[in-house]
Amino acid sequence: NHKRVYRIYRELELNLRIKPRKRLVREKPVALAVPKQPNLCWSMDFMHDQLSDARSVRLFNVIDDFNREALCIEVDFSLPAGWVKRALEQVIAWRGKPTMIRCDNGPEYISKELKSWAKKEEIMLGYIQPGNPQQNAYIERFNRTVRYDWLGHYLFESLDELQTFATQWQWTYN
């Protein structure tokens, strides 16, 4: 191991060459600012929870950063990039197209499928820096509201029950 190699090098008074770590060059994150009007910037994120039978479920949340309006709360066991794309297309058909969508670096968001769809639709995907959820503060705050208002208080038996409750809460929240 590296400690033993280091010790032997020191005992033999050899010069130890320490390689510098290669750093990934990342793009600068988009600054978190309040948009001037609706539909300029949306934020999206996932949440995890369990049904009463301990099956893991995911919630996909989308909000408008201008007025924090909940645009979409979708629930399923697995939410791949194609599913995210379809959910966003439904919201766009209802609300119109945003200029930018802010998201984290999850596998669904960095997939080629979602990137090519966003490029085709002329929507910029703004990625936050890894390990800095505060750069996506609007959706993180919304996730906290979801968790403390209803998700942490109820046990749901099925996906249909959870989706129905989420949709009703979304209309009440807005």
Map each language-model feature to its residues.
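Charged DNA-binding/catalytic regions of mobile-element recombinases
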Residues: 1-174
